[in-house]
Amino acid sequence: MLDAQTVEKPLTHIKSKADLRKEVDASGEWTVSQIEALFALPFNELMFKAQQAHEANFPEGDVELATLLSIKTGGCPEDCSYCPQAARYDTDVKAEKLMGLEEVLEAAKAAKAAGSNRFCMGAAWREPKDRDIEKVTAMIKGVKALGLETCATLGMLEANQAKALQEAGLDFYNHNLDTSEDFYRSVISTRGYQDRLDTISNVRAAGMSVCCGGIVGMGESREQRAAFLARLANLSPYPESVPINHLVPVAGTPLAEQKPLDPLEFVRTIAVARITMPKARVRLSAGRQELGRAIQAMCFMAGANSIFYGEQLLTTGNPEAEQDLALLAELGLKTKQSCKAEVLV
């Protein structure tokens, strides 16, 4: 059941999509109340509107397959409440050194052979040092040479570091907002919200595409989920890739006992993301294994068109590749073939 914070509001105050769109066009931005109104639509109506937005912008209806590799695991000095890689938490994740170039390239070759379009490299750093950037740029060049799109998530970036990654050929840089600004401090204290926005600005200024999303189910209210999506949608331009994670509670972290978000509320979140960011790749990220096949199918109906693909994400499990391909085939969904980066204009 949905909690009191996620119960649908009376429909008397809900405006039509056309009215909402006019207000957005006039102001240039989505408001939290407008996005709350979308959340509160009858489920079938919300799904229909999301499908309309999806089909208008992705008529081919394909699903992008992205593989995520942890190139440097554990030992992070930050205190993100959801993350088992934080050194201060007693989890099963052990600190490891940065992977070598050949090991990364072997993983990228395996990902391409399995059908992935994009290869994402993640490192558990607060921010990379310049010597780290030199090593990662070699990885980027090697992965690009295989014909894969590249993405990296390395923590906060200075402008010169972002430029170095772009010059190496990096297509996307991931830096999530995680949640709404007012809920953020209850989850993280070691990195400010503005720090995240500054990194996104540095990525844009360097000429790379942005991958930016967050995590739902951390105890936030529906209003806070709406505020989170409003902030994403009002970035100019909004992110080309929007990963939406469903919290995976991990033993030893502060959110280990967090009550799961209602699955239908997660589907609503995907639908609202599609409507408010119609040209973005909306990616089902962590937590898919826990959601199961039926909810994932509903997420694809709601406009999700990208998944993290492969048995392991950074530190949490993921459906096996064969299971994903079988589900997509059963739903009649084809996978994205082109490796050309999509850029919003």
Swiss-Prot record:
Keyword Metal-binding annotated: yes
The entry's keywords: 2Fe-2S, 4Fe-4S, Biotin biosynthesis, Iron, Iron-sulfur, Metal-binding, S-adenosyl-L-methionine, Transferase
Cofactor(s) of this protein: [4Fe-4S] cluster; [2Fe-2S] cluster
An example Gene Ontology biological process: biotin biosynthetic process
Pfam families attached to this UniProt entry: BATS (PF06968), Radical_SAM (PF04055)
Residues reported in the UniProt entry to bind [2Fe-2S] cluster: C120, C151, C211, R283
CDD domains, A to Z: Radical_SAM (cd01335)
SUPFAM superfamilies found in the cross-reference section: Radical SAM enzymes (SSF102114)
PROSITE patterns per UniProt: RADICAL_SAM
Cofactor binding description: Binds 1 [4Fe-4S] cluster. The cluster is coordinated with 3 cysteines and an exchangeable S-adenosyl-L-methionine. Binds 1 [2Fe-2S] cluster. The cluster is coordinated with 3 cysteines and 1 arginine.
Every Radical SAM core domain range: 61-288
Binding site for [4Fe-4S] cluster: C76, C80, C83
One of the record's GO molecular function terms: biotin synthase activity
The protein's annotated pathway: Cofactor biosynthesis; biotin biosynthesis; biotin from 7,8-diaminononanoate: step 2/2
Plastid in keyword set: no
Catalytic activity: (4R,5S)-dethiobiotin + (sulfur carrier)-SH + 2 reduced [2Fe-2S]-[ferredoxin] + 2 S-adenosyl-L-methionine = (sulfur carrier)-H + biotin + 2 5'-deoxyadenosine + 2 L-methionine + 2 oxidized [2Fe-2S]-[ferredoxin]
EC number: 2.8.1.6
Subunit structure: Homodimer.
Purpose: Catalyzes the conversion of dethiobiotin (DTB) to biotin by the insertion of a sulfur atom into dethiobiotin via a radical-based mechanism.
Family: Belongs to the radical SAM superfamily. Biotin synthase family.
Name of the protein this chain belongs to: Biotin synthase
Gene encoding the protein: bioB
